[in-house]
Amino acid sequence: MLFAIRSARRTLLAELAQALAISAHKSGSPIETHILFDSTAGFGRVSLQATNYDESYASTFNAQVDAPGRVALPTRRLHDYVRLLPDSEIAISASEPNAITVRAGCSKTLFTGIAPNVFPQASPARAPIFHLDSDILAAVLRRTKFAISPEDSRYVLNCLLLDLGPEHTRIVSTDGNRLALVELSGASAESLAILIPRGAIDPLIALTGAAGDNEIAVAVDDKRISFTAGARLLSIRKVTGNFPNYEAVLPTEQGREVKVGRQPFLDAIEHTMQFADSRKSAVKIQIRENILEVSAASSEYGEARECIEIEFNGEPFTAAYNASFLCDFLRATESSPRILFSFRDPQSAVGIRPGDGSGPFTYRYVVMPCTLS
């Protein structure tokens, strides 16, 4: 027997879900679509490795090792198979590298694998330079990832910036038309600007979900960025480049601001945006005495208009903004009953932030206006 282990289904499924987050789903080289199991270390521990070259995942988990060895199985097929099984003990064994048997109760399946030696040697984790609470990191990533540029040609804007310094820790994303920024109270002894590629964000969120009470340790070397949670390690290829000077576009003196209920504002935008011109997807925001009005109109779809009561006694204000950009922020701040909308003039960027100002971090969002027709 070349390989034989036994593991609880829940333990195995949790590891497979992490590996699936970076696995190539439809195409790619065999190494990108397979997962390596290695039980040669013994002591009831099995190591696991998956990679798509840009991101790599490595972990160890508890299992009964009946025959130490190494096998590589198709990641998605194994994950989907284990997911559908009832909770029980799962046995994985192989008498030859490309024929791996998986048993659970009365279920028995034969998987075709690949040679395990195609997987590179896993690099050891470096000493961390910074630690982040896993729940806070997950919340921060969800509040910034939607502002990452979807255009592959703008490779630096395809990344999220982790800006570490002795006075602040900031996570920033922008696509050139909007910017999301979260600032944490913790600070790093070392000043670093780390670019995290868009494709690594969801695997990193998955890692935070599996971290439990563990903090996420961040380590950096010349080629890769590593995030470690307990026995789990996510390694990301380092992106080189200069992120834009985001501080230059942060509004400073806005002059006027309005507090508005988050859910009523979101409802009004969602109701009216379906009537917006499909080329711009813009809604018009009009603020006047005690009223915030959201409207959209197009010759193709018609017109919609909704009003929200607010407290405002300043000069009237009218501007247009991309409806989806506004909705992204409002959905990400579902725990905040009110948001603060600050503005200067229709040609300047609007600043939005949660109205309560509480929590372990500050969250700012900046949106450029659209041209009014």
Which residues are covered by each model-predicted region?
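Structural preference for solvent-exposed beta-strand-turn elements
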Residues: 1-373
